[in-house]
Curated annotation (Swiss-Prot):
Main function: One of the early assembly proteins it binds 23S rRNA. One of the proteins that surrounds the polypeptide exit tunnel on the outside of the ribosome. Forms the main docking site for trigger factor binding to the ribosome.
Family per similarity comment: Belongs to the universal ribosomal protein uL23 family.
Organism of this sequence: Helicobacter hepaticus (strain ATCC 51449 / 3B1)
Protein name: Large ribosomal subunit protein uL23
InterPro entries according to UniProt: Nucleotide-bd_a/b_plait_sf, Ribosomal_uL23-like, Ribosomal_uL23/eL15/eS24_sf
A Pfam family it matches: Ribosomal_L23
GO molecular function: rRNA binding; structural constituent of ribosome
GO biological process, one term: translation
Amino acid sequence: MADITDIKSILYTEKSLSLQESGVLVVQTATNVSKNQLKEIFKEYFGITPLRINSLRQEGKVKRFRGKIGQRASFKKFYVKIPEGAKLDALSV
């Protein structure tokens, strides 16, 4: 069962802010969350049934720190289309 803690953050980038005007919310989650689980989270915690959910997996970048090679954490990103007129107070999460 998915929980609200599976949502790491709501992404605020230039692209995501322009998509918010058309009713699409960009959410960053853990890599083990599926579309169905995210749909359940939105229904249970926000009272909204998403119209469409698109997902992509973002691999962590390889970075160097003090001569050592490391890797940033991988994550999953979801584009969630919410119904027109639905209010989602993202800051209250």
